[in-house]
């Protein structure tokens, strides 16, 4: 039996023994890191614009704990502006190799400057230059304009540290609900919904597929 087949043989006790969602998410993410061909931390991030039109795109999860799920972006981008307008978002992880999915919904907060600085400093130098060079989501007259901006900022920051732009930071989704989904034959899937109560405790409900 292959490793993927073993991982897919998820038993009901795997859900019922989980008293809270974060440990279960950590286990599933570790499994994905072993089975997904690339970017196991990729997630579809959903936002809404001021007119109520939804928007979705892939981002990379850069951290999580009981406080929430963290990703980084340009605050002047479309997603940055939409989040700043509503301060709400949702994300969906789908690991095809494991036939598993996790949905997260909740209000959003900015990460601290200390968190943003630490993560920004850990990025490759080229990515830090890119944060300055790219006017994310705005019209680009041609690839040459982007390459020119990269060259200019590369020269500007040729020596020393590259500071983090004020407009580049991170968001944390503070989940009010986290749903775990596992594929079953004949579409009789397992779905477990965790919902956070006002006191911070989690309730757990099994849902029809």
Curated annotation (Swiss-Prot):
Binds 1 FMN per subunit. It catalyses: pyridoxamine 5'-phosphate + O2 + H2O = pyridoxal 5'-phosphate + H2O2 + NH4(+); pyridoxine 5'-phosphate + O2 = pyridoxal 5'-phosphate + H2O2. It is an enzyme of class 1 (oxidoreductase). The keyword Oxidoreductase applies. The keyword ATP-binding does not apply. SUPFAM superfamilies: FMN-binding split barrel (SSF50475). It comes from the Bacteria. FMN binds at residues 57-62, 72-73, 79, 101, 136-137, 181, 191. Pathway: Cofactor metabolism; pyridoxal 5'-phosphate salvage; pyridoxal 5'-phosphate from pyridoxamine 5'-phosphate: step 1/1; Cofactor metabolism; pyridoxal 5'-phosphate salvage; pyridoxal 5'-phosphate from pyridoxine 5'-phosphate: step 1/1. One of its GO terms (biological process) is pyridoxine biosynthetic process. Belongs to the pyridoxamine 5'-phosphate oxidase family. Homodimer. This is Pyridoxine/pyridoxamine 5'-phosphate oxidase. It comes from Chelativorans sp. (strain BNC1). The gene is pdxH.
């Amino acid at each position: 039996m292959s490793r993927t087949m073993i991982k897919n043989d998820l038993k009901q006790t795997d859900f019922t023994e989980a008293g809270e969602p974060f440990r279960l998410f950590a286990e599933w993410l570790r499994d994905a890191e072993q089975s997904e061909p690339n970017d196991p931390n990729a997630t579809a991030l959903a936002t809404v614009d001021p007119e109520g039109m939804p928007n979705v795109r892939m981002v990379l999860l850069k951290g999580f704990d009981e406080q929430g799920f963290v990703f980084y972006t340009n605050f002047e981008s479309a997603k940055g502006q939409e989040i700043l307008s509503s301060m709400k978002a949702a994300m969906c992880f789908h690991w095809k190799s494991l036939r598993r999915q996790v949905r997260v919904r909740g209000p959003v907060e900015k990460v601290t400057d200390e968190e943003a600085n630490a993560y920004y400093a850990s990025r490759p130098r080229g990515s830090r230059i890119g944060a300055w060079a790219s006017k994310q989501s705005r019209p680009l007259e041609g690839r040459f304009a982007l390459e020119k901006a990269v060259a200019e900022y590369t020269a500007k920051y040729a020596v020393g540290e590259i500071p983090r732009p004020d407009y580049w930071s991170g968001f944390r989704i503070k989940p009010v609900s986290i749903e775990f989904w596992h594929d079953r034959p004949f579409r009789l899937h397992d779905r477990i919904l965790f919902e956070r109560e006002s006191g911070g405790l989690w309730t757990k409900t099994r849902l029809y597929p």
